Amino acid sequence: MKRSMYAGRVRSEHIGTSITLKGWVGRRRDLGGLIFIDLRDREGIMQLVINPEEVSASVMATAESLRSEFVIEVSGVVTAREQANDNLPTGEVELKVQELSVLNTSKTTPFEIKDGIEANDDTRMRYRYLDLRRPEMLENFKLRAKVTHSIRNYLDNLEFIDVETPMLTKSTPEGARDYLVPSRVNQGHFYALPQSPQITKQLLMNAGFDRYYQIVKCFRDEDLRGDRQPEFTQVDLETSFLSDQEIQDIVEGMIAKVMKDTKGLEVSLPFPRMAYDDAMNNYGSDKPDTRFDMLLQDLTEVVKEVDFKVFSEASVVKAIVVKNKADKYSRKNIDKLTEIAKQYGAKGLAWLKYADNTISGPVAKFLTAIEDRLTEALQLENNDLILFVADSLEVANETLGALRTRIAKELELIDYSKFNFLWIVDWPMFEWSEEEGRYMSAHHPFTLPTAETAHELEGDLAKVRAVAYDIVLNGYELGGGSLRINQKDTQERMFKALGFSAESAQEQFGFLLEAMDYGFPPHGGLAIGLDRFVMLLAGKDNIREVIAFPKNNKASDPMTQAPSLVSEQQLEELSLTVESYEN
């Protein structure tokens, strides 16, 4: 029989209609001689009623044999429920069954197919095809499809060209570790799976495509966390002849359309812009969450004369004020915050409480001489908690930024209904890597330096600024972009600043440098992390919830057991030898 419609779409206007439905048994109940079945499909749940007085003995026997997750086909007449179920979109109707057949049976599932299950993550991933049957998971992927549909429509209307770039590319330094693919034809040589289509999309601009986009899989072999996966999807854009402001305008329009199409929300344009230095100094993060206050405050000048060497001898002293919540933090609670501070490189965490117009706490005795100045500088009020970090500027900012976010979550200070977009601009071109002992690209080595600071490529790299911009949503980096270098001499200077010899630059990027001999236009673009964007729209805190078949925190797939060992024959064909491994 042909399916008439989805079970989840049956409504009161279908009363009296004969229909055929197909789906899974969610639940079976026997009440007063009648059998009630919740039939579930992609669109929702529909109640079926089997009355022994209205069906054949064989249909009744089949109904009695049904168990959860059996796949069935059922025909009958839509009728009004005696008592509506307001919790279901189909709650006003039910199907009086006339015909019923089993299309497939099912073993008992390792967890119930319903929202709010308590199964651990690896069990959910081991049986991902069952996990994806749950309504909330299906909704996540409907949302994802709406997002990509909205993006494609928007960019197509702006005459962007959707172009596929290679999955097998050249391994290049400056970034996360590559996933390498050995070549059988070219023995001893390796492809890399792309961390992004960065260079190829730039070459498309040199080819005259003018406006390119792609919704593309990318790969990075890096340590995993809640908003990272080894393979991920990004919305990749590149344009020619546009300014950074014009590119940002296009991206803002795209996001506004997605928010309207998927959430029914109008977002205010243009998005706020914040300089990188302001973000770090005021929020302790280059991806600040602006849904709550508790900004970092610099007290270096206020405390420099106190008789407390931790403060007076520190490079900077900064603080955050937790307003009207001092009573929520015992000494034990503050000790936990101190341990977190140490994880970010701080030597410790000083603190005060303010009540009855006076300060108290372990360091209060050192600050009595400046109590009035401190109270005024921090605008202290009754029941405030003050947390101090005295260290380098970088450590103070990062530590207090992390504490700010943690405390806001603990105290439920965040309005989760808000979607606060903003641009972070005026980026440094380079950042110092303690691990590498050198400056590295803050974004990538193809970012255009500002005209005012480009001369420092041969001088103080800390002073070079980039024509770069990150878009941030609710404390997450949603995406990043920049204008690109299109002049060969500037690109060669950039490589030299990063420590490349002329020979190594030619070996790694010779094809790009050669392309710059042939009229490379001014260009720039941006990439947005699609998984992260959908995660935030869906109100989730892990991108695994919006990726159909993700990896776990060990970069493994519990369902397929990937990665796995391969046969000796496969290794021999590739001239590879595995020296050692652990099962």
UniProtKB/Swiss-Prot annotation:
GO CC annotation terms, alphabetical: cytoplasm
Keywords, comma-separated and alphabetical: Aminoacyl-tRNA synthetase, ATP-binding, Cytoplasm, Ligase, Nucleotide-binding, Protein biosynthesis
A GO MF label: catalytic activity, acting on a protein
Principal place of residence: cytoplasm
An example Gene Ontology biological process: aspartyl-tRNA aminoacylation
Gene3D superfamilies noted in UniProt: Bira Bifunctional Protein, Domain 2, GAD-like domain, Nucleic acid-binding proteins
Residue positions binding L-aspartate: E174, R220, H443, R484
Enzyme class name: ligase
Localization annotation: Cytoplasm
This enzyme's EC code(s): 6.1.1.12
Catalysed reactions, as listed in the record: tRNA(Asp) + L-aspartate + ATP = L-aspartyl-tRNA(Asp) + AMP + diphosphate
InterPro entries from the UniProt entry: Aa-tRNA-synt_II (IPR004364), aa-tRNA-synth_II (IPR006195), aa-tRNA-synth_II/BPL/LPL (IPR045864), Asp-tRNA-ligase_1 (IPR004524), Asp-tRNA-ligase_1_N (IPR047089), Asp/Asn-tRNA-synth_IIb (IPR002312), AspRS_core (IPR047090), GAD-like_sf (IPR004115)
SUPFAM superfamilies: Class II aaRS and biotin synthetases, GAD domain-like, Nucleic acid-binding proteins
Role of this protein: Catalyzes the attachment of L-aspartate to tRNA(Asp) in a two-step reaction: L-aspartate is first activated by ATP to form Asp-AMP and then transferred to the acceptor end of tRNA(Asp).
PANTHER family, A to Z: ASPARTATE--TRNA LIGASE, MITOCHONDRIAL, ASPARTYL/LYSYL-TRNA SYNTHETASE
Family per record: Belongs to the class-II aminoacyl-tRNA synthetase family. Type 1 subfamily.
Subunit structure: Homodimer.
NCBIfam families: aspS_bact, PRK00476.1
The protein, known as: Aspartate--tRNA ligase
Species the sequence originates in: Streptococcus agalactiae serotype Ia (strain ATCC 27591 / A909 / CDC SS700)
